Structures are given as C-alpha cells and as structure tokens.
Amino acid sequence: MNIMNNKIRTFLKSCGWYFLASVDEGAARVRPMGFCAVLSDGRLYFGMGSDKRCCKQIQDAPQVEVCACSADKEWLRVRGKAVFSDDPAVMEEIFAGNEFLRKKYSPESGLKFAPFYLEDMEADYNKMDGSCEKWV
C-alpha cells in the first residue's frame, strides 16, 4: 500500500491543487486543498484546520472523495472513510516536512491541524481515451 500511496501523493502534488468532497446536512460540499503526505506509517494523510467547517462535516459524515486533474487531461479520484489522527508523532512528522503548516498551526497561533487518512481507500486513475486503472 505504501508504494501506491506514494504514487497517489505524487499525482496529487503534480496537480498542485485537488478537490475534496464531503457532505453537509445531505448536500455535497467541495473545496480546493493542497496538503497531502505519506508518512512513515505508510498512510496517505490529508488535513485541514480543526476550526474549519469542512473538518466538522467530515467528522459527522466521514465518507469523502478527492479528485485531481493534470494538465495532460488525466484525473485521479480517491475515496474512502476519513479517520482523524491525534497522534503527536503524526503531527510532528507533518510539521517537520511542511514549514507553512508548522508556522500556521504553532502553539502561539491557537489553531490546530486535523490530519486524517482514508480507511477502505479506493483510487481510480482515468485518461481522456476512456481508460481507467484501479490504483487501490
């Protein structure tokens, strides 16, 4: 799984931004995101501030989907059940690799980062020619 998670992360990072879909009171919500990382535990992590409405939506309805499109007109959809982590080691590893997040979510800011990984993850890689590969 670690190799596939790295492949997914590489594609998402190459796109620059991806879109995260969640559900809020029965309605779809989509927003741009930029953070993803594969940590030493082999899991692919996403995250946002714990104060964001998106965080509450995902806690209430953890089935989410991520979609990213490349300049080559290829796209990746990743879905699963979000599982939040409050493990200090996870947070430390995320902040060690991301100066922006480390500063934004420093103890002085009063803000808290809420990382999550996807359980029962599925991923489809698609091309404009109609081909589709199951990555997970």
What are these regions (language model features)?
Residues 10-26, 64-68:
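A short, Trp-centered hydrophobic/proline-enriched beta-strand micro-motif
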Residues 36-71:
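A short mixed-secondary-structure module that forms the rim of ligand-binding clefts
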Residues 28, 42-44, 123, 132:
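Hydrophobic residues embedded in beta-strands of well-ordered beta-sheets
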Residues 77-136:
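Charged, gly/pro-rich active-site loop segments
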Residues 1-6, 48-54, 99-101:
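Charged, amphipathic alpha-helical segments
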Residues 19, 43-45, 77, 124:
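General beta-strand recognition
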Residues 33-37, 80-82:
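Hydrophobic/aromatic beta-strand elements that line small-molecule binding cavities or substrate pockets
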